[in-house]
């Protein structure tokens, strides 16, 4: 009051010593008293009230306790990631049956700019988070089963303007792997091979049916990289797509308000059988152990299916998953688009996801899902012996109890280098520090490397070799001198030694 009177007098405004205290009292004791508080869902409020008159009141589906817990856990896990150039994140929690949104929010380390960015609706590259929908389509089209074998070895795909070289996150290859392992462990090369079987156009159309709206380019534009999530999606779209799997393959709109409108009709995107098999794979700790280990942030105290994703250059990482009752999605990255420093979905988004998911069923853990009709479970045997016999789910009519390796000694194949590879020596790096690793699939018997006719010291699946300029023939041979596999490759670049010609003896091992 004193400040207001002083300001009025200094500006020579007519002031009433009685009127100003009265007005101040009305402001701070009336029904519109300004209360210092943190808005729980500012982005959602802005979205819902955008086209409504001032003073509107609208009841939304958010659960206050769930919203507070989700935002608190998101903020808590983002703090230690600041040292790895991670500032922002978003979380979305929905109820599967009704589609009601229970938590919706973002957290930003840059409040001045982050408050204007809705992390739930922002478009980001999906990374590996799209793979479950690719394999679900392959199951429905009877192209693949969870037991089908896919080749995880170096692959060069011709695309417009050159070659596309998909690589796994760990830059290692596993050879022949079942689809179950390929999806659960998020192997990239098998996903690209699966896309070539399904067709990019068919996969693109299925993603559109899942409500992913930014896919307005042609199949040729996305190419084989679509299998690895080159498309832009929002957390909102991705969570609802995973909710579709939780609901047996049926998609419907998410619900933000309790207005007198019926639940949106459901449309069938995948069969219940395909949705169940994908869910079973995404909840399989053993199948994901190749990449993530048996104990990892995706392991919940009850049945839940989950998938991570990391976009190119580590600009975005995701963890999306569901129990029979809830679907939870977490995005971690930077609203500015800057890359993170060595942060993947398993280390960035997954810890938030698993803590929230474990907290949600606080009134009792959900029961495991029951298989739908027309699914059968058969014991399968892999003839090449690299995978132990196990039981697997099949859609009736697709089962096969013996999966043969038609390539004979295919499991002995050289994984790296691929045939015809041309390596370039780097003149700025000392030659003895440059290495090429010869790798093979896990052998079933004693094998040896032979380079240009001379045996190399073998160090197991991967043998390092110091390259020099020349042309080479690399063979993988058994103890009886039979060639199991061979490749030709070339090394180019500055070298103090004369170029090596194919056929000359050269032994270099580390």
PLM region spans:
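A short, well-structured edge-of-sheet supersecondary motif
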Residues: 20-24, 84-113, 205-210
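A structural microfeature
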Residues: 102-103, 148, 457, 485
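Soluble, non-transmembrane domains of envelope/secretory-pathway proteins that act on or interact
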Residues: 24-40, 154, 158, 304-510
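Conserved catalytic neighborhood of penicillin-recognizing serine enzymes
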Residues: 4, 10, 33-50, 97, ...
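Second-shell loop/turn segments in exported
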Residues: 2-14, 31-35, 54-61, 80-81, ...
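A penicillin-recognizing enzyme superfamily signal
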Residues: 60-83, 91, 95, 104, ...
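Non-catalytic, structured segments within soluble enzyme domains
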Residues: 1-68, 72, 205-220, 224-229, ...
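Active-site SXXK
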Residues: 1-9, 70, 99, 120-152, ...
């Amino acid at each position: 009051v004193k400040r207001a009177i002083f300001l009025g007098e200094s500006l020579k405004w007519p002031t009433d010593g009685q009127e100003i205290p009265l007005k101040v009292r009305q402001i701070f004791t009336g029904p519109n008293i300004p209360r210092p508080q943190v808005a729980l869902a500012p982005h959602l409020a802005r979205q819902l009230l955008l086209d409504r008159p001032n003073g509107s009141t609208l009841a939304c589906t958010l659960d206050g306790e769930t919203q507070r817990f989700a935002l608190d856990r998101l903020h808590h896990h983002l703090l230690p990631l600041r040292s790895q150039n991670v500032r922002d994140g978003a979380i979305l929690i929905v109820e599967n049956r009704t589609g009601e949104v229970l938590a919706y929010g973002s957290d930003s380390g840059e409040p001045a700019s982050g408050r204007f960015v809705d992390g739930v609706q922002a478009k980001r590259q999906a990374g590996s988070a799209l793979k479950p929908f690719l394999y679900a389509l392959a199951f429905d089209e009877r192209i693949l089963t969870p037991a089908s074998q896919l080749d995880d070895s170096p692959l060069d795909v011709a695309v417009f303007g050159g070659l596309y070289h998909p690589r796994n996150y760990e830059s290692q290859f596993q050879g022949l792997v079942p689809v179950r392992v390929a999806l659960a462990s998020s192997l990239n090369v098998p996903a690209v091979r699966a896309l070539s079987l399904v067709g990019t156009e068919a996969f693109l159309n299925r993603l559109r049916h899942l409500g992913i709206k930014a896919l307005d380019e042609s199949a040729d534009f996305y190419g084989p990289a679509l299998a690895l999530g080159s498309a832009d999606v929002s957390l909102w779209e991705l969570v609802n797509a995973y909710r579709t799997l939780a609901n047996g393959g049926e998609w419907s709109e998410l619900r933000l308000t309790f207005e007198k409108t019926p639940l949106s009709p459901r449309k069938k995107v995948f069969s219940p059988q395909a949705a169940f098999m994908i869910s079973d794979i995404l909840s399989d700790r053993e199948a994901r152990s190749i990449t993530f280990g048996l104990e990892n942030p995706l392991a919940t105290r009850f049945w839940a299916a989950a998938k991570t994703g990391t976009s190119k250059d580590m600009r975005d990482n995701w963890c999306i998953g569901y129990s029979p009752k809830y679907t939870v999605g977490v995005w971690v990255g930077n609203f500015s688009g800057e890359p993170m420093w060595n942060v993947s979905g398993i280390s960035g988004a997954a810890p938030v996801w698993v803590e929230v998911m474990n907290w949600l069923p606080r009134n009792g853990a959900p029961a495991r899902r029951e298989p739908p009709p027309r699914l059968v479970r058969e014991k399968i045997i892999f003839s090449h012996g690299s995978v132990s016999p196990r039981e697997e789910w099949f859609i009736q009519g697709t089962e096969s109890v013996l999966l043969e390796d038609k390539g004979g000694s295919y499991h002995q194949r050289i994984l790296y280098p691929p045939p015809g590879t041309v390596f370039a020596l780097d003149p700025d790096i000392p030659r003895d520090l440059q290495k090429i690793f010869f790798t093979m699939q896990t052998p079933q018997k004693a094998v040896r490397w032979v380079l240009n006719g001379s045996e190399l010291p073998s160090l197991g699946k991967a043998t390092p070799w110091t390259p020099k300029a020349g042309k080479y023939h690399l063979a993988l041979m058994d103890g009886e001198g039979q060639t199991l596999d061979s490749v030709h490759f070339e090394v180019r670049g500055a070298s103090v030694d004369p170029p090596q010609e194919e056929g000359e003896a050269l032994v270099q091992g580390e």
